[in-house]
A protein has these predicted regions:
Chain B
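Mid-to-C-terminal alpha-helical segments outside catalytic/metal-binding sites
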Residues: 1-22, 27-51, 222, 226-231, ...
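Active-site neighborhood of phospho(di)ester-bond hydrolases with catalytic His/Asp-centered motifs
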Residues: 15-18, 52-54, 94-96, 121, ...
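Conserved, mostly hydrophobic/aromatic
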Residues: 19, 43, 80, 112, ...
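Divalent metal-dependent hydrolysis catalytic cores, especially in the metallo-beta-lactamase
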Residues: 20, 38-66, 91-96, 118-121
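Acidic/histidine-rich helix-loop elements
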Residues: 22-34, 61-71, 159
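Active-site environment of divalent metal-dependent phosphoester hydrolases
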Residues: 23-25, 58-61, 99-103, 127-128, ...
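Active-site gating/metal-coordination segments in enzymes
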Residues: 67-155
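Catalytic pocket-lining loop regions of alpha/beta-barrel enzymes
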Residues: 117-119, 131-233, 281-282
Length: 260, 283
């Protein structure tokens, strides 16, 4: 099982312990995960994606289970070539942070990026939030990704594949039930921020949407990696082993060979 | 599920959740019984020996959650007492009060203790350092009741529907009442936990529960470093999956086994009256 939501590098608004690839490899082994889609955390607040992407590929090179998920911003000159370059270098998914770039839902540039990712057979990886709103720095004014962003991107083309991490039940349901059945099939969600018991939002979503819509994400190094597995372990007895999707299956042609 | 470990859950050592909530038919939710069942079921899966719980009035149905009316306080406490009586082997409870109705609050504590309440729950009805809270703490001292106080970690502004307090406010109250143990609620429950830890460090009669939906890496490590394991209490509040995550994290952040036991249950056993948790003490 692949962790679709991991980063390396420091976080601008607080200290996070050991956000380095070697530590991530040890954590994945401890959690018995086969690998992770890894982004460069500080890049979310950078303007030019290139230095962060270069740092990401260099840092991950020695670690075959850490799969690069670099950032492409479609309002940056030359982004199409940048996308082609990172795909050629082994990117397994493409991160975008439209809320950090001031890009509104339905913006043609984001739609173009979604279509370009589909052409490259890479999932477009979106992050709803890095931290709880209640503890966010006054300087962190981007706000959460909206359901409208996701709905617009899911409607851009039949080959589009979108993975959304860090959403709660409300955003997931608003998006899912605001799409056609075909469009829903283009969107996957991690459940790191979805509440378990006693509210049992996760169990509810599995029942109503289907387990295949969900992938495994931890939000390391920001959050405890134990949380997603705890959510699985506390499912009601009739929902144990729900059969969620392995994010690794969403870009099968490009996953780097794993050590056996 | 292939590829993700489904580990054997820890069932061997005692475990006390010092911050739990139950619902009742006056709580405005038709699924209130399902919520209560889900908490007990998840608690059994995690290995919770005792839930120390409260009912917050009508949870906003007939008066605000954090400003409950006297009638809702009483009705909620009655529901909590009944639930605790029906599950006496695993549920203990706090008497919830609103300090704005001082006479009612004091009478309610006396009444609830007679019904087996083991602590006092204060919400966000009045800021923690307000003198109006003093009579309640004086009664808690006489009755040797711990006080679980709802806290916002580092309040930088007012938030709607609550008169929030933070670690500094609670430290002021605790300094005035050194014989009372105050449980600072949900270190992971929103706001900036990093501010809370130094705010209460020099006030030894404040301990922190680890509950809340927040599972920031580094929070447990810093809590242990600044407060020490003997001032931390494991708890879940509204999200039991985050409680389980933090429980598992306690095993990998380098704590000695004795420290883990302190956080799991021994600190709670020390804070509450002797005999409150007989199944733990037997273990």
């Amino acid at each position: 099982m692949i962790d679709c939501a991991a980063w390396i590098g420091p976080y601008p608004f607080r200290e996070v312990p050991h956000p380095d690839p070697a530590t991530l490899v040890r954590v994945l082994e401890r959690e018995r995960l086969t690998g992770a889609w890894v982004g460069h955390l500080p890049s979310a607040w950078h303007r030019d994606p290139r230095p962060g992407n270069a740092a990401l590929f260099a840092a991950l090179a020695p670690y075959p289970t850490l799969l690069p998920a670099p950032m492409i911003r479609p309002d940056w000159p030359g982004w199409e070539q940048m996308l082609a370059d990172v795909v050629a270098k082994g990117a397994v998914a493409i991160r975008a942070y439209p809320q950090h770039w001031g890009i509104q839902p339905g913006d043609s540039r984001m739609n173009a990026l979604a279509r370009a990712c589909a052409t490259s057979a890479r999932p477009l990886l979106l992050t709803v939030r890095f931290e709880d709103l209640r503890q966010r720095s006054p300087l962190d004014v981007a706000g959460d990704l909206s359901a409208a962003h996701v709905r617009a991107l899911a409607r851009t083309g039949e080959d589009v594949c979108i993975v959304v991490t860090g959403a709660g039940r409300e955003l997931i349901e608003e998006t899912h039930w605001g799409l056609t059945p075909v469009e829903r099939g283009r969107v996957y969600w991690d459940f790191a921020w979805v509440w378990g018991p006693p509210e049992e939002h996760f169990a509810h979503l599995l029942r109503t949407m289907g387990a295949e819509r969900f992938v495994y994400g931890t939000h390391w190094p920001l959050r405890l990696t134990q949380n997603s597995r705890a959510n699985l372990d506390l499912l009601p007895a009739d929902q144990r082993d729900p059969g969620i999707t392995d994010a690794g299956s969403l870009s099968p042609r490009f996953v780097r060979e794993m050590p056996t | 599920m292939p590829g993700v470990a489904m580990r054997e859950l820890p069932q061997t050592a005692p475990l006390i959740d010092v911050h739990a909530h139950f619902y009742h038919e006056g709580a405005g939710r038709s699924d209130w019984a399902r919520l209560n069942d889900a908490r007990v079921r998840a608690g059994d899966t995690i290995g919770v020996t005792y839930h120390v719980a409260s009912v917050l009035g009508s949870y906003g149905h007939t008066s605000p959650t954090y400003f409950p009316s006297p009638a809702d306080v009483t009705r909620g406490n009655d529901a909590m007492a009944a639930l605790a009586a029906s599950q006496a082997d695993r549920v203990r409870w706090y008497a919830t009060v609103n300090p704005n109705d001082t006479r009612h609050a004091l009478a309610e504590i006396e009444r609830c203790v007679a019904l087996s309440a083991v602590g006092v729950k204060l919400l966000a009805s009045r800021r923690a350092d307000d003198p109006l809270v003093d009579p309640i703490c004086e009664l808690a001292a006489r009755q040797r009741l711990p006080v679980l106080h709802h806290i916002w970690q580092h309040r930088t502004r007012d938030w709607p529907n609550q008169e929030i307090s933070d670690g500094l406010d609670l430290a002021c109250l605790a300094a005035r009442h050194p014989k009372v143990t105050f449980i600072l609620a949900h270190l992971g429950g929103g706001g900036d936990w990093a501010h809370t830890l130094p705010a209460i460090r020099e006030t030894p009669n404040v301990v922190a529960d680890l509950s809340g939906s927040g599972v920031d890496r580094g929070m447990l490590d810093q809590a242990v470093e600044i407060l020490g394991a003997r001032r931390l209490l494991w708890a879940c509040d509204l999200t039991m999956e985050t409680g389980l995550a933090k429980l598992r994290a306690l095993d990998v952040i380098g704590l000695a086994e004795g420290d883990v036991m302190d956080v799991r249950w021994r600190n709670a056993a020390r804070i509450f009256a002797t005999g409150t948790f007989p199944r733990c003490e037997l273990a």
